[in-house]
């Protein structure tokens, strides 16, 4: 049962990571003027530009391009972490934890709290479940069902 839960969680992390990579790359190109996609992409870019410019605090100094690059980086980290966790490698859980740190960093960087905080809490809980499911073998990764 632990394995089924862990595989489900890793699949969710992998899919969300791939979405972050795709959206981050798409929006970086949109922000850089490499292409112009109408509709939601235009609205999302305008909203991000407004958000970044209106922040009193932006510790790192994100621009829309670097912000979307960071989103894509987070997607790469969580995707690789999910694959590592599925392969029962300790580094998988380490990368998933790095993703959580990156996600939390965005809230600290902009000194803001918004509904996306719930995604951070959910990801943290899911990571805790992965750790729980894999403990006991020393790897931090989920054991195969029936393995000693």
Predicted segments with their positions:
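Topology signature of small-to-medium multi-pass alpha-helical membrane proteins
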Residues: 1-148
């Amino acid at each position: 049962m632990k394995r089924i839960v862990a595989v489900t969680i890793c699949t969710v992390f992998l899919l969300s990571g791939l979405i972050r990579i795709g959206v981050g790359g798409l929006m970086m190109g949109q922000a850089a003027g490499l292409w112009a996609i109408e509709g939601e992409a235009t609205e999302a870019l305008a909203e991000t530009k407004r958000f970044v410019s209106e922040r009193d605090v932006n510790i790192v100094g994100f621009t829309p391009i670097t912000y979307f690059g960071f989103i894509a980086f987070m997607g790469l980290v969580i995707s690789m972490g999910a694959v590592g966790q599925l392969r029962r490698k300790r580094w998988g859980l380490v990368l998933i934890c790095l993703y959580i740190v990156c996600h939390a960093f965005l809230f600290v960087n902009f000194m803001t709290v918004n509904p996306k905080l719930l995604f951070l809490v959910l990801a943290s809980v899911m990571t805790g479940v992965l750790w729980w499911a894999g403990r006991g073998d020393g790897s931090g990764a989920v054991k195969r069902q029936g393995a000693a």
